[in-house]
Amino acid sequence: MEAYKDIVNIDTELLSGQPVFTGTRVPIESLFMHLEKGISLDEFLFDFPSVSKEHAIAVLEIAGKIVSSKNIEHIYETTT
């Protein structure tokens, strides 16, 4: 897997620092919002052609590692 910084960009000058797919203005959150609504990954990629399938899958893998981490309680506590 690529380093997360190759996939996720956080820049205060871009969308007020909201995490976006690197090289785009597409918020990472939009991927999860699509999936939560039952919209397929392929449809998300159609809606946001600037996001590569590899980067979308990598974000899902990163999220999977975070939620399956032994440190999930600490991570969750610091974000709420």
Model-derived segments and spans:
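N-terminal first-folded block
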Residues: M1-R25
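C-terminal structural segments of small proteins and small subunits
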Residues: E54-E77
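Intrinsically disordered, low-complexity and often Lys/Arg-enriched segments
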Residues: M1-Y4, I75-T80
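Amphipathic, hydrophobic secondary-structure cores in small proteins
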Residues: P27-E61
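Surface-exposed beta-strand edges and their flanking turn/coil or helix-capping segments
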Residues: P19-T22, L35-E36, L41, E73-I75
